[in-house]
Amino acid sequence: MTDQEYMLRAIQLAKKGEGWTNPNPMVGAVIVKDGRIIGEGYHKKCGELHAERNAIASLTESAEGATIYVTLEPCCHYGKTPPCTEAIIEQKIKKVVIGSRDPNPKVAGKGAQILRESGITVVQDFMREECDRLNPVFFHYITTKTPYVVMKYAMTLDGKIATKTGASKWITGEPA
């Protein structure tokens, strides 16, 4: 498998958390050693272990010298769970490939910096566009502190939503 395929697998795993992780982001992680996936995980639910720790918990062998592909920069602070950076360092993982940068002020580059200071090779912005697409709601909220709102409004050319008699007509559909 290629680096892109490992990150695509991490993205696929992250999507399993859709609808469950709020207010946290969806994150997936894949641990690779000698060209084989030896662990994988995703953030399943707010308050539970993050993707990196779930991937570590699923290890089939030692992660020493392995590479972890993660869709979002690993956290480096204590919250409902301990920092993922600590777990990565403890496992002696040699390389971390990060998709999206975490805009949360508690992380925002600090996670990558801690890993580098521990002698770990860090690659950032790998398939960033694809990884960023996982969490537009999280990114918007964490940077603006306002809700992410999507609205769809359909009307006829004269600005109406029904006929003069009040009867509804289909004015939108799948193509919209």
What are the roles of these predicted feature ranges?
Residues 1, 23-30:
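Polybasic, low-complexity association/targeting segments
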Residues 44, 71, 99:
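Conserved residues at the C-terminal ends of beta-strands
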Residues 44-57, 171-175:
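A short, polar/charged loop-to-alpha-helix boundary motif
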Residues 53-78:
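Mobile, glycine- and charge-enriched loop segments
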Residues 1-21, 37, 78-176:
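Zinc-dependent deaminase
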Residues 40:
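Short glycine-/small-residue motifs
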Residues 27-35, 153-154:
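Short beta-strand scaffold segments in enzyme catalytic cores
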